[in-house]
Amino acid sequence: GELEYQMSQPTVEEGWLHALTIPRELFIQNGKLHQRPVKEFERIRRHERVIEAEGYTFIDQETWSVELLAEQLSSQKISFNFGNVLKIYFDNNNLLIQRKHWNMKGYDEVQVEISELENIQVFLDQSTAEIFVNNGEKVFTFKAFFTDEKGIEIESEQTIL
């Protein structure tokens, strides 16, 4: 049941269970509620890399404390794979996010329709993923337990930044 599911999370052994999300600012844009990370997060960025990706791109990572900001997407077919734990796909106005389940085979997934994908901002740490789509029009928070595979794979039909 639910108790067994909650207690199966890897962080239970470390003495904690639930997630504390990053601070965010709420605002109204075009009559819709949006969310974005607070500006103060920009001040704590370290080791910033700007990468232009086209076709298949692999980004090697030393840690799972990551912020990825992809812009200039122009609604193309695109996918992001974070260590085979979190996968994000966009194609034909469909955004699909898959998160590897920590104690069963397979992935949990959420799917939403969006008219276009302009940008995506992803924050990761050892056990949490936060995804901001189109300047916070859609926002997702997941428990995601990353393993030793620390690479990010990006596949796109056009150049993204």
Residue ranges of each PLM-predicted region?
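Beta-rich accessory regions
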Residues: G1-L161
